[in-house]
Amino acid sequence: MIAEITGQDFTDQVLRSELPVFACFVARWCHTCFPTCFVADELAEEYEGKIKFVRIDAEKNSEIRVKYHVIALPSIVLFQDSQPVNRLLGYQERASLRESLETLLAERQTSTGTLDRDDGKTKDDQSDSL
């Protein structure tokens, strides 16, 4: 089951997550959101412990929707290291979602360090100078 989060939870659940995050923006009136949510629920079980899955009601959380340029529903925004790294608009087939998730995990494994926001150096660069 995917946790539904609000603006209050967004920072802790998405931006501070140690795992990559699959954030699915939906609305009750959106007919294509239902099959997307069904597929996302199945993928959440498959990727448990590797990717965090959250659902965000786009109508109730307009500030987040605007900040992350959610212009269509459903919209899926993939986050890594607190940054949006991919955006999928509209209904997505299971194979397309799985491909995006596998790419996200592969990129995570091949990354060479995360940027330190103050000086632009990676954590690896900083450890070399100690």
Language model region names:
Residues 111-130:
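Short acidic DE-rich linear segments
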Residues 77-112:
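Non-catalytic, surface beta->alpha helical segment in thiol-disulfide oxidoreductase systems
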Residues 19-21, 68-80:
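Structural micro-motif
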Residues 25-39:
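Conserved redox-active cysteine motifs that mediate thiol-disulfide chemistry
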Residues 1-12:
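N-terminal "domain-start" segment that seeds a small globular fold
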Residues 4-6, 25, 40-44, 48-63:
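Thiol-based oxidoreductase modules, predominantly thioredoxin-like and allied folds used
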